[in-house]
Structures are given as structure tokens and as C-alpha cells.
Regions:
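Active-site scaffold segments
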Residues: 79-83, 103-105
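Short, charged beta-turn/beta-strand-edge "cap" motif at the junction between a beta-strand
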Residues: 107-111, 125-128
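Short glycine/threonine-rich loop-to-helix capping motif typified by GTGT followed
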Residues: 110-120
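A short beta-strand-loop-beta hairpin characteristic of the jelly-roll/cupin
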Residues: 63, 87-92
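Buried hydrophobic packing segments
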Residues: 40, 82-89
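Beta-rich strand-turn-strand
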Residues: 90-100, 104
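Catalytic-core "active-site belt" of small-molecule-metabolizing enzymes
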Residues: 2-77, 118, 126-134
Length: 134
């Protein structure tokens, strides 16, 4: 099967109530408690021949700049977390399955989207991806 790469981002959703007992961000991220909807674009053609490690991404909300990040944020190269995951799942006998999507981690930090907001991530030569939180 083909190994594809897509530019994308996640619209965070959190199962915790936002009050004075709200856990720290590191706990939310490590627990997967901020997982939400994955928004991704078409497969990137020729991605193996491009420098994906030093790619920048700019995040906008409703057309307004929010944050900028770099692919080096994902454990210094976006393929390192993918390799770790594949090895760990193989070691435990689970393995990766055809068609599964893997997100390598945030490059711009976590924002909590509000209903009706449209987020756009500009990945430069890898394209733009947009999603509206409903």
C-alpha cells in the first residue's frame, strides 16, 4: 500500500470542564484528552524528495494570524514520532493498519476552537488546509 503524507491539523476538543480544576496542558496532551477532528488536505506528491523537517506552518483563525510553527517541533523531525509509533505498535503486537491516519503532533500549540470559527493552516509548499468548527 502507499505511504502518503498530508498537511493537516486537529481542531481540539476537550472532555474536561474549563474551571479551577482544569488539568495542565501537558496532562491533557499526554492523555489524548484534547483530541478532536482531524482536518487534512490531499496527499502531498513527491513528499519524500522534499525537506519536510524544516517546513514552517502559519495558523489563522477567521483570516487573522494566530501562530507560527516549524516541523522541527515534532520531536526534531515529523517522521520521528511516526517511526516511534510504528515500532512501539509492532513491539506490542498491534501494528499499524492500512488506512490509519497518524498525526505527528502540534507545530503551533493548542487552541480551543469556538463554534463557527474557521482555521486555516498554511504549510507553504505543502499547501493550505482549512476547517470550520461546528
Amino acid at each position: 500500500y502507499k505511504r502518503q503524507m498530508h498537511a493537516g491539523f486537529e481542531l481540539a476538543e476537550c472532555r474536561f470542564i474549563h474551571d479551577n480544576k482544569f488539568p495542565p496542558l501537558d496532562a491533557i496532551l499526554s492523555d489524548g484528552a484534547g483530541s478532536g477532528t482531524l482536518v487534512y488536505g490531499p496527499a502531498i506528491q513527491g513528499w519524500k524528495d522534499k525537506d519536510i523537517a524544516d517546513n514552517e506552518v502559519t495558523l489563522f483563525c477567521n483570516g487573522v494570524f494566530k501562530r507560527k510553527g516549524n516541523a522541527l517541533t515534532a520531536m526534531e523531525h515529523p517522521l520521528i514520532p511516526v517511526t516511534w509509533l510504528a515500532n512501539e505498535l509492532s513491539r506490542t503486537g498491534i501494528g499499524l493498519k492500512r488506512g490509519q491516519l497518524i498525526s505527528t503532533g502540534t507545530l503551533t500549540g493548542m487552541l480551543i476552537p469556538k463554534k463557527g470559527e474557521t482555521y486555516t493552516a498554511d504549510f507553504g509548499i505543502f499547501g493550505r488546509v482549512s476547517g470550520t468548527y461546528k
